[in-house]
């Protein structure tokens, strides 16, 4: 039997003070039985004003706790059918003062957050944090059609959920967990992030721009622009995209799970935005944005399901001239762990039928992505792996990725999808890359390196100047909006004063006319005109400020446009510069000479002060190779060490290693790939025959060529000093 109840959302964190209380975290959803309010003497309508009720007794749907919580800490959402609890009487009790928003955010971060920031959890080409991917995949596998998904609380308490989230992702097995526990862990994950998926700065901007936006579609375009701002890490946008895909998938089976776009947006917009100061009107705007994103954005992009493949024709080495027994690492078209952006670059302006294979961005072991050129566009096709078999869709019939690719080099992919009537004709070979370096002697190549590096630095400075203008203009726009709001309030006060004076002036003017007191009449009229004149001045000032704001908003958009136009040039210049640098490095050019061409101020060969290369501690692998140590142990080993101190360990990614190095006082981590061509940090730099050879090279070559934030060499093995 169900009873009528009410739903509330927590606006602030609250730490329970008595045994009968429950904790509140920002965004928690709570339900209160109507009968419990009636028993306390409250009538219909008062439920919408929890701050006037005082203390409420209810159920926290997010944490699974039941008890008392302060009405000043929550906002009313609406009515809901619930299972009736037994209300318990309680003596009168004073309410705590609701904290200010700024304090709440800080407290929330300290008390609730146990997860690192999204920018620290993953990096492109990954599409989302590994832990989030695991949770979503497990939920979709177990509960896609569950009619109580995300609305029924499991028996797990917050501490147990946090313990689950703290587990090592690689070894985490979610098969044993009930779907409702997984759903609670999913919501707890979103709550425990130090910053919401849609940052507060974006939410604030969305709400402040509300008067200028005409439709929800404009809101969505504005959201995309704000969250893609250079000041916000790209991981936030990727995570939002991943979550929207999950919500869309749920909404596709809403006839069974009852989770349509509206319900999902009401459930998750508080967790995605986490914006406590929004009015009910603004909250509805934010809910509507998520609803439209779920129901339209992904509905348009979702591809039609793939047709089941026909049984493959038997192929042999004899009749197709291809070797199905070749290892994947040796295949010229297999590029390993490269990003989608790099793939797009390699396939740009190529003929239909051009293809390559890379590791799938989901990082599920054995899954890959085939990227194929068709109709002038890149088509991404997932290669699945299960029970030792590979294929594009069930049933998986190929024994290896090589066998699968070789099959479709002879047969059209129309067997798999009628719209893909093309064969895999032209592999993009990792062994035959375009020869960017045309010059044939070291001095000539060095001069070209200097030219490209100079162009790159000029473009970088131009981009930095634009970014400073972009930030300054954004701040000025915000200040002008605040000033306009202040003008509006001032005008409102003056107009009210003017109306009051006008009302009373009529009475006094009539009185003074009867008395023949012309002086007082003139004084009243003068004061009234003075007040009207002041209002007119303020209105003019506001109008001028609004005109300035429009001009500055146009300038802001123009700066944004110019920044976006410079980005491709920056990427291309850096890529070309790095290829020249790699060519010179392979020819054995010393860092001193490279510094001269790169225009670095400190061109002295710092390594000439060190003993001969043979005396370097790097030759002893025990000084830097720590074996199967994990990320946390690596950070503990390197904490407090000087810049350039490093170690190499086995990576959680099978067959690879990780380098951990101190940069600007912080420990950074980067993957070392192991490929058919050798070890390296990225294609086409995977050239070193051993880890030792790679370490010796980067002992005098900066890692900055692979990552702008890693301007450091592998100078000091972590155990070197202890062994001296």
Curated annotation (Swiss-Prot):
Residues 113-301 form the Rho-GAP domain. The modification Phosphoserine is found at residues 154, 279, 608. Residues 3-79 form the SH3 domain. Residues 333-428, 624-718 form the SH2 domain. The record marks 151 as: Arginine finger. GO terms for molecular function: 1-phosphatidylinositol-3-kinase regulator activity; enzyme-substrate adaptor activity; ErbB-3 class receptor binding; identical protein binding; insulin receptor binding; insulin receptor substrate binding; insulin-like growth factor receptor binding; phosphatidylinositol 3-kinase activator activity. Residues 79-112 are annotated as: Disordered. Keywords: Acetylation, GTPase activation, Phosphoprotein, Protein transport, Repeat, SH2 domain, SH3 domain, Stress response, Transport, Ubl conjugation. Residues 84-99 have a biased composition (Pro residues). The keyword Protein transport applies. GO terms for biological process: cellular response to insulin stimulus; insulin receptor signaling pathway; insulin-like growth factor receptor signaling pathway; intracellular glucose homeostasis; negative regulation of apoptotic process; phosphatidylinositol 3-kinase/protein kinase B signal transduction; phosphatidylinositol phosphate biosynthetic process; positive regulation of D-glucose import. The modification Phosphotyrosine is found at residues 467, 580. Transmembrane segments: none annotated. The modification N-acetylserine is found at residue 2. Heterodimer of a regulatory subunit PIK3R1 and a p110 catalytic subunit (PIK3CA, PIK3CB or PIK3CD). Interacts (via SH2 domains) with CCDC88A/GIV (tyrosine-phosphorylated form); the interaction enables recruitment of PIK3R1 to the EGFR receptor, enhancing PI3K activity and cell migration. Interacts with PIK3R2; the interaction is dissociated in an insulin-dependent manner. Interacts with XBP1; the interaction is direct and induces translocation of XBP1 into the nucleus in a ER stress- and/or insulin-dependent but PI3K-independent manner. PANTHER family: PHOSPHATIDYLINOSITOL 3-KINASE REGULATORY SUBUNIT, PHOSPHATIDYLINOSITOL 3-KINASE REGULATORY SUBUNIT BETA. The SH3 domain mediates the binding to CBLB. Belongs to the PI3K p85 subunit family. This is Phosphatidylinositol 3-kinase regulatory subunit alpha. It comes from Bos taurus. The lineage of its organism: Eukaryota, Metazoa, Chordata, Craniata, Vertebrata.
């Amino acid at each position: 039997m169900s009873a009528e109840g009410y739903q509330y959302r927590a606006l602030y964190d609250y730490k329970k003070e008595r045994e009968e209380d429950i904790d509140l975290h920002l965004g928690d959803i709570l339900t209160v039985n109507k009968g419990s309010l009636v028993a306390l003497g409250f009538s219909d309508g008062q439920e919408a004003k929890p701050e006037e009720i005082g203390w409420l007794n209810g159920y926290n749907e997010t944490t699974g706790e039941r008890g008392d919580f302060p009405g000043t800490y929550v906002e009313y959402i609406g009515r809901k059918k619930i299972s009736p609890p037994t209300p318990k009487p309680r003596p009168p009790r004073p309410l705590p003062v609701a904290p200010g928003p700024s304090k709440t955010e800080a407290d929330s971060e300290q008390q609730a957050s146990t997860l690192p920031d999204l920018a620290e959890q993953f990096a492109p080409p990954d599409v989302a944090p590994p832990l989030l991917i695991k949770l979503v995949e497990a939920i979709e596998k177990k509960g896609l059609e569950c009619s109580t998904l995300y609305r029924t609380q499991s028996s797990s308490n917050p501490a147990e959920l946090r313990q689950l989230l703290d587990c090592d992702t690689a070894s985490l097995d979610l098969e044993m967990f009930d779907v409702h526990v997984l759903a609670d862990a999913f919501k707890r994950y979103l709550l425990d992030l130090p910053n919401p998926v849609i940052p507060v700065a974006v939410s604030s901007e969305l709400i402040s721009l509300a008067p200028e936006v005409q439709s929800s579609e404009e809101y969505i375009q504005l959201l995309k622009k704000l969250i893609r701002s250079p000041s916000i890490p790209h991981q936030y946008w990727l995570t939002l995209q991943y979550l929207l895909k999950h919500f869309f998938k749920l909404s596709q089976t809403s006839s069974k799970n009852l989770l349509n776009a509206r319900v999902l947006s009401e459930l998750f917009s508080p967790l995605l935005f986490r914006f406590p100061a929004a009015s009910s009107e603004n909250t509805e705007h934010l809910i509507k944005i998520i609803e439209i994103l779920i129901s339209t954005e992904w509905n348009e992009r979702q591809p039609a399901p793939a047709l089941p493949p026909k049984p493959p024709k038997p192929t042999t080495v004899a009749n197709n001239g291809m070797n199905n027994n070749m290892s994947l690492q040796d295949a010229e078209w297999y590029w390993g762990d490269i990003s989608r952006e790099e793939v797009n670059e390699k396939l740009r302006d190529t003929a239909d039928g051009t293809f390559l294979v890379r590791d799938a961005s989901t990082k599920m072991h054995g899954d890959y992505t085939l990227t194929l050129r068709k109709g002038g566009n890149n088509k991404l096709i997932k290669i699945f792996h299960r029970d030792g078999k590979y294929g594009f869709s069930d049933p998986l019939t190929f024994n290896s990725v090589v066998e699968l690719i070789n099959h479709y080099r002879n047969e059209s992919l129309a067997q798999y999808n009628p719209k893909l009537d093309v064969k895999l004709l032209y592999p993009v070979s990792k062994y035959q890359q375009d020869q960017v370096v045309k010059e044939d002697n070291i001095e000539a190549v060095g001069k070209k390196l200097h030219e490209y590096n100079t162009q790159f630095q000029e473009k970088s400075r131009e981009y930095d100047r634009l970014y400073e203008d972009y930030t300054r203009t954004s701040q000025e726009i915000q200040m002008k909006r605040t000033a306009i709001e202040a003008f509006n309030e001032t005008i409102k006060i003056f107009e009210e004063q003017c109306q009051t004076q006008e009302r009373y002036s009529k009475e006094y003017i009539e009185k003074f006319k009867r008395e023949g007191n012309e002086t007082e009449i003139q004084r009243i009229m003068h004061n009234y005109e003075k007040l009207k004149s002041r209002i007119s001045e303020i209105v003019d000032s506001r109008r001028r400020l609004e005109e300035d704001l429009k001009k500055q908003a146009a300038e802001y958009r123009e700066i944004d446009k110019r920044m976006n136009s410079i980005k491709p040039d920056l990427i291309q210049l850096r890529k070309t510069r790095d290829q020249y640098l790699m060519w010179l490095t392979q020819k054995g050019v010393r860092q001193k000479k490279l510094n001269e061409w790169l225009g670095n101020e400190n061109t002295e060969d710092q390594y000439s002060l060190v003993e001969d290369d043979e005396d370097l501690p790097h030759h002893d692998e025990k000084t830097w190779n720590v074996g199967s140590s994990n990320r946390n142990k690596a950070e503990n080993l390197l904490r407090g060490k000087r810049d350039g101190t490093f170690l190499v360990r086995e990576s959680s990614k099978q067959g690879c290693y990780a380098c951990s190095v101190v940069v600007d006082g912080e420990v950074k981590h980067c993957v070392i790939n192991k490929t058919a061509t050798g070890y390296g940090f990225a294609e086409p730099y995977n050239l070193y025959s051993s880890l030792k050879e790679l370490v010796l090279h980067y002992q005098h070559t900066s890692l900055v060529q692979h990552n702008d934030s890693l301007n450091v060499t592998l100078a000091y093995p972590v155990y070197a000093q202890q062994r001296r």
